[in-house]
UniProtKB/Swiss-Prot annotation:
Family affiliation: Belongs to the FAD-binding monooxygenase family.
Protein name: Cyclopentanone 1,2-monooxygenase
Catalytic activity: cyclopentanone + NADPH + O2 + H(+) = 5-valerolactone + NADP(+) + H2O
Species in which this protein is naturally found: Comamonas sp. (strain NCIMB 9872)
Presence of keyword Oxidoreductase: yes
Group of enzyme by EC: oxidoreductase
Transmembrane portions of the chain: none
Pathway assigned to this chain's UniProt record: Alcohol metabolism; cyclopentanol degradation; 5-valerolactone from cyclopentanol: step 2/2
Residue sites binding FAD per the record: 31-32, 51, 60, 71, 77, 123
């Protein structure tokens, strides 16, 4: 195996070509990739990172649409690296995209990350050579990079999805996908704005547009069962009070299902009286954030009656905020549209109140579907509505889209699209049979979409780094997932998924938002602590489930 050493700054300047073979090439400069870069470099690996964007931050580099912000409270939406949290102060409890960029730039300065990153480097293809046991990675406008191992940290939102609507190319106004928003911003003041989609970005954009746009029309297929954010501005004194509590909060992240510092209640909703249930639900509601979703009764995502209790409480709270009963029925129907919590809820600040404004209209596309787009606007069965700006808040080809968008080829000439055509198969959510020496973080069949991003970045990052150290210490130059092991991993996920209420919601969690995509759990839904335990079980047995060769 090639000796692993650290390259100098002169050898790997920012945006310079990589002129030597690497031990590890990292793809993606979000929380996960940067964490691995920092620690692998400290451990003496010859490592470099490439990213398609012009700056670090991953999703927070690309997402700068109006209202874009974190849906996790700032205390745990950060690295647990002491030199960062001890010095950085947050301005809001739920930071917006601009604050997140400030945080990443602060981390870059403190940890000296950019010297080992090539920006504006979008990976197009990669081919594995069995003879050299190396990947050759190609991107437009750059020299090929050779690396013993590649770790792709592409996130679950790397591949935006825009619906195929007839006539979009004829529209004379502006149109954008929220994930590809112009970095210079877009002025919505005084404009007629259409927002297609009511996922998290749709909710956030709608709130902001309603403040000063002339007219806002929200096209909704499924209502977002959003929760109150309870935003708060933070002073220097607030930050000072928070800091002593952070180490314990970081420690709790690895012990809670979704990598937060709170977890489900060890009580069943069906076993409590109505008064007891209401008291608990009221407390969760008033706490704000995701507690109503992820600190609720332990049975509500598995038992339909328990789920009804949770939904009905939410419904009644929301309907009280909406003046028009017909609009209330579309936004918070008397009968739940799907099990509550089976789709990721957005956190909102004044979303439901905007529909009481004269300049905001809600269109249910189940009743009046979008037929086409014209040069002036959008046509439904009720006629044409004219717009100056169309916003596609239509989400992503989530979780797998980042990997399938790159033409990774093994020495049988297969791509991820080929081997996953009948469903995802991975071992521990980090590798797929047929692709030796290619690992991925925050990817398919990992906690990813069910986990706080920084928690996943650190815990899974540590597990991958321990794996890399094992390979180095034992002179192993080739690792590949075993087919039998990944079948067992996939069955574990499928069995749990099918025992829950999640399959009853058409969601990106199972790929049902993308036409033609196989419907299956894209993530590991058994929780972060179980994931860590399963990974460690493999490690204790010399990484059982992988084929290793010197």
């Amino acid at each position: 195996m090639t000796t692993m050493t650290t390259m100098t700054t002169e050898q790997l300047g920012m945006n310079n070509s990589v002129n030597d073979k690497l031990d590890v090439l990292l793809i993606g400069a979000g929380f996960t990739g940067l964490y691995q870069l920092y620690h692998l470099r400290k451990l003496g690996y010859k490592v470099h990172l490439v990213d398609a964007g012009a700056d670090i931050g991953g999703i927070w580099h690309w997402n700068c649409y109006p209202g874009a912000r974190v849906d996790t409270h700032c205390q745990i939406y950060q690295y647990s690296i002491p030199e960062l949290w001890q010095e950085f102060n947050w301005k809001e409890l739920f930071p917006n995209w601009a604050q997140m960029r400030e945080y990443f730039h602060f981390a870059d300065k403190k940890l000296d990350l950019s010297k080992d990153i090539s920006f504006n480097t979008r990976v197009q293809s990669a081919v594995f050579d069995e003879g050299t046991r190396e990947w050759t990675v190609r991107s437009i406008g750059h020299q090929p990079i050779q690396a013993r191992f590649v770790i792709a940290n592409l996130g679950f939102g790397a591949s935006p999805s825009t619906p195929n609507v007839d006539g979009i190319e004829t529209f004379k106004g502006q149109w954008y996908h929220t994930a590809l928003w112009p970095q210079e911003g877009v002025n919505m003041a005084g404009k007629r704005v259409a927002i297609i989609g009511t996922g998290s970005s749709g909710v956030q954009v709608a709130q902001e547009a309603a403040l000063d746009a002339k007219q806002v029309t929200v096209y909704q297929r499924t209502p977002n069962l959003a929760l109150p954010m309870h935003q708060k501005q933070l002073s220097a004194e607030d930050n000072l009070r928070m800091k002593p509590e952070l180490p314990a909060a970081f420690e709790r992240r690895g012990k809670c299902f979704a990598g937060f510092d709170f977890d489900f209640i060890a009580k069943n909703a069906t076993e409590l009286s109505a008064a007891e249930r209401t008291e608990i639900l009221e407390e969760l509601w008033n706490a704000g954030g995701f507690r109503y979703w992820l600190a609720n009764f332990q049975d509500y995502l598995f038992d339909d009656k328990a789920n009804d209790y949770v939904y009905e409480f939410w419904r009644d709270k929301v309907r009280a905020r909406i003046k028009d009963p017909k609009v209330a029925e579309k936004l918070a129907p008397m009968k739940k549209p799907h099990p509550y919590g089976a789709k990721r809820p957005s956190l909102e600040q004044w979303y439901y109140e905007i529909f009481n404004q004269n300049n905001v209209t809600l269109v249910d596309v189940n009743e009046t579907p979008v037929l086409r787009i014209t040069e002036k606007g959008i046509v439904t069965a009720e006629g044409e509505a004219e717009f100056d700006l169309i916003v596609f808040a239509t989400g992503f080809d989530a979780v797998t889209g980042g990997l399938t968008s790159i033409d990774f080829r093994n020495n049988q000439g297969q791509s991820f699209k080929d081997v996953w055509s009948d469903g995802i198969r991975t071992q521990l959510g980090v590798a797929t049979a047929g692709f030796p020496n290619l690992l991925f973080g925050y990817g398919p069949q990992s906690p990813a979409g069910f986990c706080n991003g920084p928690s996943s970045a650190e815990y899974q990052g540590d597990l991958l780094i321990q794996l890399m150290n094992y390979l180095r210490d034992n002179n192993i130059s080739r690792i590949e997932a075993q087919s039998e092991a990944q079948e067992e991993w996939s069955k574990l996920i499928a069995d749990f998924w099918d025992s829950s209420l999640f399959p009853r919601a058409k969601s990106w969690y199972q790929g049902s938002n993308i036409p033609g995509k196989k419907v299956e759990s894209l993530n590991f839904p058994l929780g972060l602590p179980t994931y860590i335990s399963k990974f460690n079980e493999s490690a204790e047995k010399g990484y059982a489930g992988f084929s290793l060769a010197s």
